[in-house]
Amino acid sequence: MPATRGELEARITEAMVKFEREFMGRGPTEARTYIIDDMILVRLKGIITRAEHHLANADTSGRGRDLIKQSRIELLEKARPMLVEILRNLGFNAVSMHTDLSIRTSERIILFTLDHPWS
């Protein structure tokens, strides 16, 4: 019997949290995945460390926030093949990945587009 949408979303969430812990060194405090047509949206909350939070708030120029954001995005881009493989192992073929993070809310959004709609 094929997995339900909810089961697949839970598996993706579990795999993404594991990736964050093992590759990035710290997991999110909250995570949720949504499968929407030909997209997978992953929302990770609580991803910024205390040290990064202090750096981000140390000056008003925004330089600390920019450094954190730039390094976090670069790290995720380097890990793109691993993330695509995680999804492939769960039965999805991701054709692109888009990401952004908010230092202010300590939240990352990852959007994967798939080769066809989920059904």
Features from the language model and the residues they span:
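Interaction-mediating elements
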Residues: 1-119
